[in-house]
Structure formats: structure tokens, C-alpha cells
Amino acid sequence: MAKELIGNDWDQILNPIFTSDKYHELHNFLKKEYSTRQIYPDMYHIFTAFKLTPFNKTKVVILGQDPYHNPGQANGMSFSVMPGAQLPPSLRNIYKELYDDVGAIPVNHGYLKKWADQGVLLLNAVLTVPYGHANGHQGKGWEDVTDAAIKALSKRGKVVFILWGRFAQNKIPLIDQSKNFIIKSSHPSPFSADRGFFGSRPFSRCNTALINFGETPIDWQLPEKVSKSDLI
């Protein structure tokens, strides 16, 4: 068994990856990267999504591409930013659709931990990024980890996969659609939100699918303020 990297059932699920030669290469690459330049998130938050949402608690996956690459933003959860950080444009659009869809009042922070605590795995396909260099760690080995997570959840079944944009939708072949439910649309980025994201009602559709699976729906309303006890 590999050293516990996450601290919950994901360690066992991902053990074949964590004990592989390719992951060892990724680990060595990251050690050098973190020691020589600014990488986001900090190394203590790389596995935040997995830590907050154990395998056996995951009901929903919202798949992103890679972390935000500017200071004070990335926290290990896709689309989420640290409290106090300016809301990224994509997240502003997510909040707009959230209000239009289920009436959730937009908040002034982008800290999505409440979703993760309810079983929403906020997963980026690539878990680290160099400062100012979007997709800078693509193809270095993270995809093996996150693809394995998607496959394991798909095999277990009764998971709602929310896939925004072409990159996320390229993961559809990993998902057994007879046992899971896929919600897809254009990306919430300002460049594409008007081409199908707005009006797609992903949050209410997700909850309908969860109810059909016999699961408790997600309370999408975020707290107005983030308490210190909620910080990870």
C-alpha cells in the first residue's frame, strides 16, 4: 500500500496509480517544480477535492481543467477560489445560472466547500499549475490519477457528472451512461456561456437525477460568509 496521500477511501481506490512508476515520475517532477518556481495550489491543498469528498460520499462530479494560475485563487477545488479572492468570470456566470435555475442567492465569495461537504467532487483533471501558465502541467501524469477516479466512480454508479465545455466532455468515454447521469453544456466562461450554458439548468437537473437515484439532493445555496472553521 502506498503512503496515505489523501487520508480516506480514495487512497485505496487510487493505490494502483499512486504506486506506479509514472506517478513516481510525477512526484519527482513536482518536487522540482515546487522548489524552483511558484506552483498553485500550495502542496498542502493539491488533494483538497479528494479529502473533502470521499469516494463513498461522492454523488456529483463537477469537472474542471486545471487550477487557477494567479496568486490567492487556487484551493484544490475546481471553479472555487479562496475567500477574499475576486470572483473569476466563469464563477460569476455559474452563480448567475444558479440563481436563474434554483433561486440560490449569489454570494460575494467563491469558496465552494459547502458543495464538497455534501458530496460534490470539485475535480480538476490536472491538479497543479505554474504561476501564470494555464495548462502548464498538462500531460505530466495527473490525468492518470483523475481518469482513474472518474472510472472508479462510474463503475460504482449513481453519480451525476456535470461536464462544461469540450475538455470536460472528452471524458465521456470513461463514464458508463447506463449507471450514471451526464449533464453537459458549453463552458461558463464569458467566451462560451451564451452558447448553451445559460439556461441549461444543471443544478436542478442534477438534483432530479439524484432523487431518481435515491440520493439526497444538493443544497446549492452557499453561505453568505465563510467562517474560519470552514477553511481548509
From Swiss-Prot:
List GO terms (cellular component aspect). Answer: cytoplasm
One MF term from GO for this chain? uracil DNA N-glycosylase activity
Enumerate the CDD domains for this protein.
UDG-F1-like
Q: Where is the active site?
A: D66
Q: Which family does it belong to?
A: Belongs to the uracil-DNA glycosylase (UDG) superfamily. UNG family.
Question: Which EC numbers does the record give?
Answer: 3.2.2.27
Q: Which gene encodes it?
A: ung
Q: Name one GO biological process term.
A: base-excision repair, AP site formation via deaminated base removal
EC main class here is: hydrolase
What's the name of the protein? Uracil-DNA glycosylase
Arranged from A to Z, the UniProt key words for this protein are: Cytoplasm, DNA damage, DNA repair, Hydrolase
Q: Which organism is it from?
A: Lactobacillus acidophilus (strain ATCC 700396 / NCK56 / N2 / NCFM)
A family per Pfam: UDG
Which reactions does this protein catalyse? Hydrolyzes single-stranded DNA or mismatched double-stranded DNA and polynucleotides, releasing free uracil
Entry's InterPro entries?
Answer: UDG_fam1, Ura-DNA_Glyclase_AS, Uracil-DNA_glycosylase-like, Uracil-DNA_glycosylase-like_sf
Q: NCBIfam families per the record?
A: PRK05254.1-1, PRK05254.1-2, PRK05254.1-5, ung
